[in-house]
Design a protein with these regions (language model features):
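Short secondary-structure junctions
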Residues: 10-12, 54-56, 198-203
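Phosphate-binding site of ATP-dependent enzymes
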Residues: 53-166
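Short, flexible loop/turn elements at secondary-structure junctions
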Residues: 21, 64, 75, 130, ...
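A short acidic-Thr-Gly-centered motif at the start of a beta-strand
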Residues: 48-53, 212
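Conserved N-proximal alpha/beta basic substrate-recognition cap immediately N-terminal to
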Residues: 1-48, 66
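Short, surface-exposed charged micro-motifs
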Residues: 143, 208-210
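C-terminal active-site "lid" helix and adjoining low-complexity regulatory extension at the edge
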Residues: 166-204, 211-238
Length: 238
């Protein structure tokens, strides 16, 4: 949340932060950065926020974790009441929520609301779910590896679902296969370099980029301390 707010305050396009539930034990700077958006603790508050904001789909991301653990995508049709929750989390009788490392879709209302209550009860942030660009029936986003002021690597991550993390056996694709216009690649590069420049002591980062469906306008989803390119070697040509 703090990183996302820093990027947004600098005028860089991001997937918007909608709400949060930051535990008191988090560092004060993280709480301060998240104070500009509402706090929600349960499914009822989430539905109220979505209806008030006229938003039908959101991402729920835990404050702690990696490899898509706990990351969930929620879609709600206000008029019909139909719901769908995409998540790797599953209820466990002893442990509460467990990470299955496999994306599942839940559509039963009672099950969805129960899972949402548990997910939102943990430290998390909520972001707007933007429709991603598509390639041959897959939605995709980009993972950029930026080091020492240059873009070293750019990889597409393809998925049939809303979550593209490669840890979920999604499909990596070389950026050249997308045949993106040079102007789009230039815009992605410029955005990544501007983001890294906001952190003078940071020499490398893995930056997740969403390309909006239709316009291909880039938005930063998040920044990571490592490139995390599974099965890829950015130095393979050395």
């Amino acid at each position: 949340g703090a990183c996302k707010e820093t990027l947004a305050h600098a005028g860089l396009p991001v997937t918007e932060l909608l709400a949060k539930n930051i535990p008191d034990r988090m560092p004060k700077f993280a709480q301060d950065k998240a104070a500009v958006c509402p706090t929600i603790h349960n499914a009822a508050q989430l539905l109220e926020l979505m209806q008030r904001s006229n938003i039908s789909q959101v991402f729920i991301k835990p404050v702690h974790g990696s490899g898509a653990a706990g990351v969930s995508a929620f879609r709600w049709q206000h008029r019909s009441g139909k719901m769908a929750l995409y998540t790797c989390a599953m209820e466990h009788p002893q442990m509460g929520l467990a990470n299955t490392k496999r994306l599942r879709r839940f559509s039963d209302t009672d099950t969805v609301l129960r899972l949402l209550d548990q997910l939102l009860g943990m430290g998390c942030i909520l972001e707007r779910w933007h429709a991603k660009a598509q390639y041959q029936g897959y939605s995709y986003d980009l993972r950029a590896v930026v080091q020492d002021g240059r873009l070293d690597y750019l990889l597409a991550r393809l998925s049939k679902g809303p979550i593209t993390n490669l840890q979920l056996n999604n499909r990596p694709l070389d950026i050249d296969a997308l045949e993106l216009p040079a102007s789009v690649v230039d815009a992605v590069t410029d955005l990544c370099l501007k983001a890294l420049a906001l952190y003078p002591g940071l020499t490398s980062a893995g930056i997740d980029i969403l390309l909006e469906q239709g316009s291909l306008r880039p938005r930063i989803i998040e920044m990571n301390g490592q490139g995390d390119l599974i099965y890829q070697d950015i130095y393979r040509q050395n």
